[in-house]
């Protein structure tokens, strides 16, 4: 009997029925082998499979996923039920034929024993069949859920692997297990989670901002009219410029003290903020104040939902103060927005809506992500998430739920042993390049009451934290097949931190991001249009988006982004303090600084004018062998390539170092320049930013353009004393500038001297530093 059963199994493995072939063709998987043995007993289990799946996931899946996953099972069950009777008839005929053959070949007692064995094994096989069917269905459901949970994840291919690990899979990790737990559509507001936004809606700045209704005439007038501006001086921030295109500009003075109860903070922020911010309140700070003077003024502007540009955020001085206060504003905004949605869910559940009442529940955008935080490195993203956890948790004994926390710490944290112990760099370098400095990342964060979900799919996230490069690879470019930027359509709060570092990375990524902010999405992404705010449907989201821009310096490119892309209807506030002394005062060596002004007709012709001025006026003075050991500092990589090609064409004795130069090439170039074997050394600003090497052997210094960071000017000038051999009297420094370099010039020499140099009829100005 056992031999015949094995023979039957081998025949079933080698042959396939029409229905099995049809099943393979329809569903892409092979029909289970043992269905023929235990089909009659397995029928109830297979038919109940979709019901058990629905019942187990009905409360834990989002609506879109529930429909697609259960639809597959219902279709599978329907197909099985339709063909069930035909398959049973065929199997009964085959079993009758086999039984007749068995009666002729074997005795009755052997046949009885064989039948008993058959029944026992059939039961066990039936159990295995049920388990196989359930496991296959579960895998299919998981795959379906994974493909449908985030449309943009198929495009997030690059750079989400842990540091030092090669990318093995083409898709990034996203948390698809906690979809229902953090779904805004299926959750309701807890009784004790109400906040100030529900208690005082008329006074809450959040409610005033999102409920403000713009008119078509105002939009048209703002597009053509110049902004109205007013200036004011604050105690800490200094000189402020208030501007607005939509209304008469309103300025306000910061009060001396801040009452947390009047700031309309959502629970539990009123109680957790003081402890989270306590590290900055030591010393002369008043014990009853929860903000530093700087944080107090910054938060008042943030909480008024005006755009803000603060160009004095430095990693060494006040970077963490600023990070704490904008994280408070971001988490406060998200908690208020989600609380409004959950409260409306409860209202909709408790009452039947009548005609014309849908507008009362318009509380969302076209997509869920409402806050985008752009930071340069993974270490910054790690600190932002840690602040979110601290603000939600505080000193409460009850810990909040943070999903995927261990994975996040592994991918965004760093090992202190990886840093060379003998590496000596300036303090500002140590403050910027701390921790994990990978600049290609993006992560979604979902927040619901007292729970945080890390690695949430973008379209299920409240907050997106990413680098410009991480966003650029998912936004894509014109003509690319795999690109997505719908998740940017309803961003209500955009925070760009450490904007000056993006000038050293790739500023084009920032411009590309700003050009794709608040565009109408190409897909609905399962949105309930009856819950979408009217100004979002009208494609006016950009007039309601608040942008917070933080950097370490005043730069024309950063100013351009703030002036062009920040058009919030509430107005804009920019900090415009001018440097009085300049970084030239930090030059310690005795050195004559010759500033030569070049003329340019317009901004577009500055690049060519500088190049021709350099090769015709400056370079001939240094061609003599006496003027050896000349370092040429070039801020722009494109100018560097142009000069390098020209030097090669003219067969000049030079070497070069840029951010792409290999370590061996850097060592050779530094050695040749120190020994005088190469007369010129071309050095890019980005190399100096990322490495901060001290170049030895400099006797003559040329700044092809003023540095982006003003303190780089004094750093490079002080390199001359690295190899002082009595040639101090022959040292020279030449700087090229134009009238379009006013901001950089003021940062180097001071605003008063810069004004005189730009207005003077003379084109050459001399400064001498280090005089005794």
From Swiss-Prot:
Modified residues (Phosphoserine): 10, 52, 60, 64
Disulfide bridges in this chain: none
Composition bias, Low complexity: 127-136
Composition bias, Acidic residues: 84-124
The entry's keywords: Developmental protein, Nucleus, Phosphoprotein
Cellular component GO terms, alphabetical: nucleolus
MF terms (GO), sorted A to Z: U3 snoRNA binding
Main location: nucleus
Assembly notes: Interacts with CAPN3; the interaction is required for CAPN3 translocation to the nucleolus.
Protein name: U3 small nucleolar RNA-associated protein 25 homolog
Gene: Utp25
């Amino acid at each position: 009997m056992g031999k015949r059963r094995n023979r039957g199994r081998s025949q079933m493995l080698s042959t396939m029925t029409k229905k099995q072939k049809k099943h393979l063709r329809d569903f892409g998987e092979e029909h289970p082998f043992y269905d023929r043995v235990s089909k009659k007993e397995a029928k109830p289990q297979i038919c109940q499979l979709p019901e058990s799946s629905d019942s187990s996931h009905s409360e834990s899946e989002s609506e879109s996923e529930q429909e697609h996953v259960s639809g597959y099972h219902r279709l599978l069950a329907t197909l099985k039920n339709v063909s069930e009777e035909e398959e049973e008839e065929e199997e009964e005929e085959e079993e009758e034929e086999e039984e007749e053959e068995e009666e002729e070949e074997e005795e009755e007692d052997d046949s009885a024993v064989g039948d008993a064995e058959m029944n026992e094994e059939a039961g066990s096989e039936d159990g295995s069949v049920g388990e196989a069917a359930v496991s296959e269905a579960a895998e299919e459901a998981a795959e379906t859920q994974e493909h449908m949970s985030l449309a943009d994840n198929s495009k997030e291919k690059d750079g989400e692997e842990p540091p030092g690990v090669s990318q093995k899979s083409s898709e990034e990790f996203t948390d698809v297990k906690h979809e229902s737990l953090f779904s805004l559509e299926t959750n309701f507001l807890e009784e004790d989670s109400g906040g100030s936004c529900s208690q005082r809606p008329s006074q809450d700045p959040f409610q005033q901002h999102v409920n403000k209704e713009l008119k078509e005439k105002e939009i048209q007038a703002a597009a053509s009219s110049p902004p109205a501006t007013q200036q004011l001086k604050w105690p800490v921030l200094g000189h402020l410029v208030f501007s607005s295109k939509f209304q008469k500009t309103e300025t306000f003075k910061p009060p001396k003290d801040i009452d947390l109860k009047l700031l309309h903070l959502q629970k539990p922020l009123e109680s957790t903020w003081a402890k989270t911010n306590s590290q900055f309140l030591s010393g002369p700070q008043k014990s009853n104040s929860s903000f530093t003077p700087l944080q107090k003024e910054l938060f008042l502007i943030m909480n008024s939902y005006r755009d803000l540009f603060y160009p004095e955020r430095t990693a060494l001085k006040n970077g963490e103060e600023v990070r704490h206060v904008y994280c408070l504003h971001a988490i406060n905004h998200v908690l208020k927005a989600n609380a409004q949605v959950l409260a409306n869910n409860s209202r909709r559940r408790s009452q039947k809506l009548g005609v014309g009442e849908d507008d009362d529940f318009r509380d969302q955008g076209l997509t869920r992500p409402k806050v985008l935080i752009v930071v340069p490195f993974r270490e910054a993203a790690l600190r932002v998430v840690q602040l979110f956890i601290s603000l939600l948790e505080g000193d409460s004994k009850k810990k909040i739920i943070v999903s995927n926390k261990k994975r996040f710490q592994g991918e965004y944290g760093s090992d202190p042993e990886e840093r060379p112990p003998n590496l000596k760099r300036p303090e500002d370098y140590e403050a910027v390049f701390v921790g994990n400095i990978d600049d290609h990342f993006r992560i979604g964060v979902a927040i619901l009451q007292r729970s945080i979900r890390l690695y949430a799919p973008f379209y299920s996230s409240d907050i997106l934290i990413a680098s410009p490069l991480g966003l650029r690879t998912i936004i894509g470019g014109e003509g690319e097949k795999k690109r997505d930027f719908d998740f940017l359509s309803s961003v209500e709060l955009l925070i760009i931190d450490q904007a000056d570092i993006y000038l050293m990375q790739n500023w084009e990524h920032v411009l590309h991001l700003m050009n794709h902010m608040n565009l109408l999405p190409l897909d609905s992404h399962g949105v309930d249009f009856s819950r979408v705010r009217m100004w979002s449907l009208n494609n006016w989201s950009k007039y309601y988006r608040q942008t917070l821009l933080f950097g370490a310096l005043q730069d024309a490119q950063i100013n351009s982004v703030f002036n062009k892309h920040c058009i919030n209807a509430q107005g804009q506030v920019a900090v415009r303090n001018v440097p009085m002394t300049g970084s030239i005062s930090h030059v310690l060596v005795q050195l004559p600084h010759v500033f030569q002004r070049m003329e340019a007709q317009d901004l577009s012709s500055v690049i060519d004018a500088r190049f021709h001025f350099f090769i015709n006026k400056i370079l001939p003075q240094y061609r003599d062998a006496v003027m050896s050991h000349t370092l040429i500092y070039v801020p722009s990589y494109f100018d560097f390539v142009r000069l390098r090609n020209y030097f090669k064409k003219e067969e000049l004795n030079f070497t070069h170092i840029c951010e792409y130069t290999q370590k061996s090439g850097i060592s050779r170039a530094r050695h040749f320049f120190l020994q005088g074997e190469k007369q010129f050394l071309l050095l890019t600003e980005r190399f100096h930013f990322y490495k901060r090497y001290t170049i030895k052997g400099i006797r003559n210094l040329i700044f092809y353009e003023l540095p982006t960071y003003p303190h780089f000017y004094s750093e490079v000038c002080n390199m001359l004393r690295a190899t002082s051999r009595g040639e101090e009297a022959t040292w020279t420094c030449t700087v090229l500038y134009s009238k379009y370099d006013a901001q950089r010039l003021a940062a180097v020499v001071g605003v008063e001297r810069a004004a005189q140099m730009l207005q003077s009829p003379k084109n050459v100005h001399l400064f001498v530093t280090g005089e005794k």
